[in-house]
């Protein structure tokens, strides 16, 4: 419950409350270590530090200090396309469907605009689904075999 409240606090701009709620919270993918909760809020408070902090999260997952899916979800919270650097397979690695939903949050615009996002969409089959049943608000076709998302 605290995780969802922390996300609500982030989306409403109440970052100090979010900082408190994220400390050691159980996320969709695992537990958020307190020091990384602080870093994520630091990145949201100071966007100039976002890429630096994203790099710290990526490095922590590569050394095993931070679980890969926790790192991935953390990078989604700050909207960093560096989440792709973790080599997460959207089909075999991401079992929690709610984690898939997080890619559509307002904070994930940069993530969706990264060229690697198209590969994800295609691997998941979303593009074929959208062509058949209609496009979501955040994506649109740009040609017979191409699309963009915001």
Regions flagged by a language model, labelled:
Residues 1-150:
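Alpha-helical protein-protein interaction modules
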């Amino acid at each position: 419950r605290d995780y969802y409240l922390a996300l609500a606090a982030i989306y409403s701009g109440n970052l100090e409350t979010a900082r408190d709620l994220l400390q050691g919270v159980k996320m969709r993918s695992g537990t958020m270590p307190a020091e990384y909760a602080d870093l994520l809020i630091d990145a949201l408070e100071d966007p100039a530090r976002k890429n630096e902090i994203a790099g710290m999260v990526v490095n922590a997952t590569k050394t095993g200090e931070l679980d890969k899916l926790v790192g991935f979800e953390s990078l989604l919270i700050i909207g960093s396309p560096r989440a792709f650097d973790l080599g997460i397979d959207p089909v075999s690695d991401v079992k929690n469907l709610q984690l898939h939903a997080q890619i559509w949050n307002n904070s994930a615009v940069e993530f969706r605009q990264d060229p690697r996002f198209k590969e994800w969409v295609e691997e998941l089959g979303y593009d074929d689904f959208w062509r058949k049943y209609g496009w979501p608000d955040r994506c649109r076709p740009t040609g017979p075999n191409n699309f963009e998302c915001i």
